């Protein structure tokens, strides 16, 4: 993508040298199309990674439920063998301990054993295996994304659909509370399943998730954080380019009163002028980047000071609650009219002169240090350097996470080694015991042989 970004920047630089050239205009439109296409490919790759994590989440939940039912079976078998107080079901206990170890890798779990030899298990403080019952974890599927959310059915409410299936309301019944701070001090960083949920996130993020007050909802998700920052870069480039072209087309900001009395505050608007500079055939301002689902401008009738009505083009505002109104990666395309005829840009004013001012403004926009990766970053960057900073941030975060992972692996291995010293089997120790017992057997055997010979001699002598 860095190459695509550089090519787009180069096309803008070439345009500033000769704005009215059909060659430089065509190159600008072509590079803009590549920019949108490659941005979509990068975002699609991030979404695919989310889907992969989502699949792993389901597989791990299925595995946890399988372990729960296996524990019930082992509890019954161990209890049956040890109920007489004579035998010990060591092999079965080893198998059960192995399952508990596997559960501990996936979740924050605790367990206890009763006097009959049965274990009870809690996951995130909620009963999972208890009193001969396994309370299986269920999955709620998000209709928009297909993302799974693990929840406890026994703690959820539900309604029955017409087809007889249950529609669960899982508020308060989620297995994991992902809103809490992730910290070793708080013991909230335990379990592979929770880590996958955090990494995946709960939706496909875009630039609106980086707004003040919303960033905390995506900051803990590696994938969503990258999605939001990347989409923000694309949004900033697209809207900045369109804004510069809008200014050239005569778009201004002010308050308007529509024919029906509706008042628009701080609206961006212009008159309907099919013959105007940087205008389409319908008189609306030219946009290099347009939305797929909705138009960028809306024609309205405005009440003039003398009471007459006049048509204007008003730029539609973006609404975070209305995805189709946003200039986001999944809703972007290069203006189809410019794709067919790039020379519509013109860059030639009414007097026949080249519009160097607009071309230079496009060039200056790419070197303006006015953008940050997210609300927690203070460093201002340019369009040219934004993607480099984004990649560097991901790289640095990955290095930190890898260091943490390696430290945790070392800790786990040390703990496991200490554990094996207590409950494990040492081959050297077992071999030493075998030799000791063999020597003891041989010594005992020789002793018995001597006694046997002595008795035989006495009996034989007395018998004579």
For each predicted feature, which ranges?
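Structural signature of extracellular appendage/secretion-system components
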Residues: 1-464
């Amino acid at each position: 993508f860095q190459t695509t970004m550089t090519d787009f920047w180069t096309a803008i630089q070439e345009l500033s040298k000769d704005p009215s050239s059909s060659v430089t205009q065509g190159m600008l439109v072509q590079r803009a199309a590549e920019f949108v296409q490659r941005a979509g490919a990068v975002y699609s790759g991030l979404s695919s990674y989310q889907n992969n994590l989502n699949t792993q989440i389901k597989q791990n939940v299925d595995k946890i439920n399988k372990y729960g039912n296996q524990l019930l079976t082992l509890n019954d078998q161990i209890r049956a063998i040890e109920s007489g107080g004579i035998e010990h079901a060591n092999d079965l206990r080893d198998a059960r301990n192995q399952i508990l170890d596997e559960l501990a890798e996936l979740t924050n779990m605790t367990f206890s054993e009763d006097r009959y030899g049965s274990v009870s298990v809690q996951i995130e403080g909620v009963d999972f295996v208890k009193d001969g019952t396994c309370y299986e974890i269920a999955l709620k599927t998000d209709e928009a994304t297909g993302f799974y959310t693990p929840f406890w059915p026994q703690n959820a409410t539900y309604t029955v659909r017409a087809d007889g299936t249950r529609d669960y309301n899982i508020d308060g019944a989620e297995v994991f509370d992902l809103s809490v701070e992730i910290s070793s001090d708080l013991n909230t960083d335990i379990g592979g399943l929770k880590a996958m949920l955090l990494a995946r996130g709960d939706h496909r993020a875009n630039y609106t998730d980086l707004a003040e007050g919303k960033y905390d909802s995506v900051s803990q998700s590696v994938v969503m954080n990258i999605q939001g920052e990347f989409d923000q870069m694309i949004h900033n480039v697209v809207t900045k380019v369109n804004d510069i072209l809008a200014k050239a087309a005569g778009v201004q900001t002010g308050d308007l009163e529509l024919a029906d009395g509706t008042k628009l505050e701080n609206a961006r608007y212009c008159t309907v002028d099919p013959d105007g500079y940087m205008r389409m055939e319908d008189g609306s301002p030219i946009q290099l980047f347009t939305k797929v689902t909705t138009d960028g401008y809306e024609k309205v009738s405005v009440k003039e000071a003398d009471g007459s009505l006049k048509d204007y083009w008003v730029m539609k505002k973006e609404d975070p609650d209305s995805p189709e109104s946003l200039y986001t990666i999944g809703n972007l395309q290069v203006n189809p009219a410019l794709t067919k005829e790039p020379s519509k840009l013109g860059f030639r004013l009414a007097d026949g002169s080249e519009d160097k001012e607009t071309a230079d403004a496009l060039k200056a926009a790419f070197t303006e240090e006015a953008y940050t990766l997210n609300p927690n970053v203070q460093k201002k960057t340019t369009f040219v350097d934004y993607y480099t900073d984004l990649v560097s941030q991901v790289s640095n975060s990955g290095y930190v996470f890898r260091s943490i992972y390696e430290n945790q692996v070392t800790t786990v291995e040390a703990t496991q080694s200490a554990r094996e010293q207590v409950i494990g089997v040492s081959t050297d120790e077992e071999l030493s015991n075998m030799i000791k017992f063999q020597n003891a057997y041989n010594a005992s055997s020789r002793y018995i042989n001597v006694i046997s010979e002595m008795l035989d001699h006495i009996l034989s002598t007395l018998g004579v």
